[in-house]
């Protein structure tokens, strides 16, 4: 059976299992707080670009159990009273999130979910699915953008994406990260992204030679970018493109040629020479062929003559790191008295120990230099913008510290839903792109390096750090038995 449009059951089975446990024990409506964060920067990068909020909003707005959902869950053995609870499900969650296009960093909350425990549990899988994928693609695009600077970047990866939804949402994420357009027509229609298409090698093969193929294409399409590497780029493809451009003159807009194979650095220089000598200095050279930021960086070091970059497989699949690794952890739970109790997850791996409590992240920016000095994590309700001085220190290597003065502090997490009601106006994609560029400009160059960037400071307020240490000590003592030594 073809799947319906409902995403409510886009979750792991154990979420439903836990929801029924909470329901049976009468704690399903207990208030809880969960936070999404990732532990390491993707691609060993100095930053990540947050993406996925728009899809999160649509997912949560439409969250309800259909009759077919209930029937299927009944077939899995869930009991009647619990199914009645699901049948009457109404979103009551309060959600805060980073804004799309904003820079985010490891070990800070980027989405925060508060509300009835069972509802918080239900949405975990979908939220992680969305954030893990889209943030990864946006970050990959930003890395490529940082290497090519102001040159056009086209997303060409649809056929290599992990299925159709990944292709269109991945395209949108790539645009947030810095792509100028896409070859994906559906993404262009849905999101208003500029679309660009040339033609494939098949066109040349159908006609048997470049000249006839280019002439046929030009008879239908005025804007012409000819793919010149089907047989021989320099001896056949480019000369044929020039011949067609000359013969048709002003009847077409000869925009340039595309190279999809071979030694692109060497070939592009020769192609540039051929085009210039033929009187087409404004014709652009488009390059594709399994490009990414590392390949492009090397091509630029070799002074390749590329004007437009088409990046497909390695962008849309985040080829060198296929998973962001974001997690969703409970940080506070309502106790028997109705008060919120901070909670922590311990681990033998230090990086997997969670940070307790409902928090806010503050982006600290120097007023004098206009650059971000770091992110400062406080308990929710603390207003850092009123402070005149912040003493920041590394939460693990506490001897690494600095004092910041004369700063602006902007909260990272903004209100999206309040008790199930959407309170956030989704911005246009153009606005998100502009916001992303402005946020990126605030980052010091040391954090932007593609290779071995400097570590961006993400520091805990002293009271959070101390509470975390105290909770670790308390939980370990309880696990070992009161008074026992480890």
Q: Where are the language model's segments positioned?
A:
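A residue-level signal for beta-strand positions that form part of recognition/binding surfaces
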Residues: 33-35, 92, 153, 327, ...
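Short coil/turn segments at secondary-structure boundaries
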Residues: 71-72, 139-143, 157, 448-455
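Short, positively charged
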Residues: 75-83, 163, 389-397
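Buried, small/hydrophobic-residue-enriched core segments of structured protein domains
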Residues: 1-31, 40-42, 77, 83-92, ...
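N-terminal, Lys/Arg-enriched amphipathic/low-complexity engagement segments
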Residues: 30-88
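Gly/Ser/Thr/Ala-enriched C-terminal appendages of enzymes
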Residues: 1-30, 44-45, 278, 283, ...
């Amino acid at each position: 059976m073809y799947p319906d449009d409902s995403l409510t059951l886009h979750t792991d089975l154990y979420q439903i299992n836990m929801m029924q446990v909470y329901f049976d024990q009468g704690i399903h409506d207990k208030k809880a707080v969960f936070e999404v964060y990732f532990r390491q920067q993707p691609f060993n990068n100095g930053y990540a670009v947050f993406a996925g909020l728009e899809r999160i909003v649509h997912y949560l707005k439409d969250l309800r159990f259909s009759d077919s959902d209930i029937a299927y869950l009944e077939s899995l053995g869930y009991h009647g009273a619990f199914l009645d609870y699901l049948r009457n499900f109404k979103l009551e969650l309060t959600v805060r999130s980073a804004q799309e296009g904003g820079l985010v960093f490891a070990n800070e909350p980027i989405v925060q979910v508060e509300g009835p425990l069972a509802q918080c549990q239900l949405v975990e899988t979908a939220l992680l699915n969305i954030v893990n994928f889209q943030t990864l693609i946006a970050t990959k695009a930003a890395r490529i953008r940082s290497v090519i600077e102001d040159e056009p970047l086209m997303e060409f990866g649809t056929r290599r994406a992990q299925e159709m939804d990944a292709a269109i949402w991945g395209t949108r994420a790539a645009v947030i990260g810095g792509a100028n357009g896409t070859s994906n027509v559906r993404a262009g229609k849905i999101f208003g992204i500029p679309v660009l298409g040339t033609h494939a090698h098949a066109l040349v093969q159908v006609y048997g030679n470049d000249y006839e193929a280019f002439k046929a294409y030009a008879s239908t399409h005025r804007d012409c970018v000819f793919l010149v590497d089907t047989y021989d780029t320099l001896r056949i493809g480019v000369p044929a493109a020039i011949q067609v451009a000359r013969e048709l003159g002003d009847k077409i807009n000869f925009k340039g040629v595309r190279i999809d194979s071979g030694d692109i650095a060497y070939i592009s220089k020769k192609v540039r020479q051929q085009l210039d000598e033929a009187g087409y200095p404004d014709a652009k050279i488009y390059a594709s062929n399994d490009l990414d930021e590392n390949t492009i960086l090397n091509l630029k070091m070799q002074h390749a003559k590329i004007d437009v970059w088409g990046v497909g497989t390695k962008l849309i699949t985040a080829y060198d790191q296929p998973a962001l690794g974001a997690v969703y952890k409970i940080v506070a739970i309502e106790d028997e008295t109705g008060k919120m109790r901070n909670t922590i997850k311990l681990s033998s791996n230090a990086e997997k120990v969670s940070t307790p409590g409902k928090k806010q992240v503050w982006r600290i920016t120097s007023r004098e230099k206009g650059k971000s000095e770091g992110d400062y994590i406080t308990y929710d309700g603390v207003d850092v913008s009123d402070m005149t001085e912040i003493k920041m220190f590394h939460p693990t290597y506490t001897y690494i510290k600095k004092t910041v003065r004369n700063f602006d502090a902007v909260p990272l997490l903004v209100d999206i839903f309040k008790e199930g009601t959407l309170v956030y106006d989704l911005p246009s994609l153009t606005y998100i792109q502009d916001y992303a560029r402005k946020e990126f400009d605030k980052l010091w160059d040391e954090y932007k390096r593609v290779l071995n960037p400097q570590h961006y400071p993400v520091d805990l307020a002293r009271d959070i750090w101390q509470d975390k240490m105290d909770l670790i000590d308390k939980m370990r003592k309880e696990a070992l038995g009161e008074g026992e030594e480890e």
